[in-house]
A protein has these predicted regions:
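Acidic, Mg2+-coordinating catalytic modules of nucleic-acid enzymes
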Residues: 4-7, 11-29, 33-249
Length: 249
């Protein structure tokens, strides 16, 4: 980002959230409304009650821009959790292909390059980076994203469904089985009726990625169903739990 672009970014930032982060005890950077709803509800759980007793600044920022807050975080010395998506190629559904895939997330690439300037930001390398706790910068910034422990998810919603149904993105079920899962769980997700312009019968195989593609326009409704059914603790992805646990320290 050029100096002019950075200046424009901070002009905009001052208008929307400067006072909130300056006076905060800690900060959570997140991508969208579903993350905000989920994290705010999670902070009411006994496990994370220390966070509810502090002034936490919530800053909405996409994966391409969260890295731009690094200098400000360091200047203010505010312990910050950046929650983002690993964003590998969505068509990858085999573990080996997933691990070879490259993230498109600019913030993850930026922070990964500090430790590994000459390495590609493949999913396999990023998993190892996180396992080595290199995603934590000076105990001040924690880059929080999905790993193999979240069923190889690439988004929050995938990680949540993987956790609740004890599955991986590589797993598939018949459409009829997904219908039963939705009925039993009372979770509000969509099941596609068509794939590649062909009607899907109840015996046809549907992946979790098909489910999320069909639900993409109703993510907020899905999140409300999680909250209203009291599933926040049981559906908590490991990557989010790890980030919130670190932030409490």
């Amino acid at each position: 980002m050029s100096d002019k672009e950075l200046a424009n970014f901070f002009d905009w930032f001052f208008e929307i959230g400067y006072s909130e982060i300056v006076f905060a005890d800690k900060a959570i950077f997140y991508e969208g409304d579903t993350e905000r709803l989920f994290i705010r509800k999670a902070m009411t759980l006994e496990k994370y009650k220390k966070l509810s007793q502090q002034y936490i600044a919530f800053i909405q920022v996409g994966g391409a821009y969260a890295k731009n807050y690094e200098k400000l975080i360091k200047l203010l010395g505010i312990k910050s959790l950046i929650i983002t998506d690993i964003d590998y190629e969505k068509e990858k559904l085999i573990v080996a292909d997933i691990e070879d895939s490259i993230t498109t997330n600019a913030t993850i690439k930026h922070f990964y390059s500090y430790n590994h300037p000459n390495d590609i930001s493949s999913v396999k390398n990023l998993y190892a980076w996180k396992d080595a706790n290199e995603n934590i910068m000076d105990n001040l910034i924690y880059i929080c994203f999905q790993t193999g422990n979240d069923g190889y998810a690439r988004t929050l919603e995938e990680a949540m469904l993987n956790k609740y149904f004890s599955m991986n993105v590589t797993d598939t079920y018949k459409k009829s089985e997904w219908i039963q899962k939705r009925t039993d769980s009372k979770l509000n997700f969509s099941i596609p009726n068509k794939k590649n312009d062909k009607k899907i019968s109840e015996d046809d195989i549907v992946s979790i990625r098909d489910i999320l593609a069909s639900t993409s326009g109703n993510k907020t409704d899905f999140m409300y169903s999680v909250i209203m059914n009291g599933y926040v603790e049981n559906i908590m992805p490991k990557y989010i739990d790890g980030g919130l646990t670190w932030l409490m320290k």
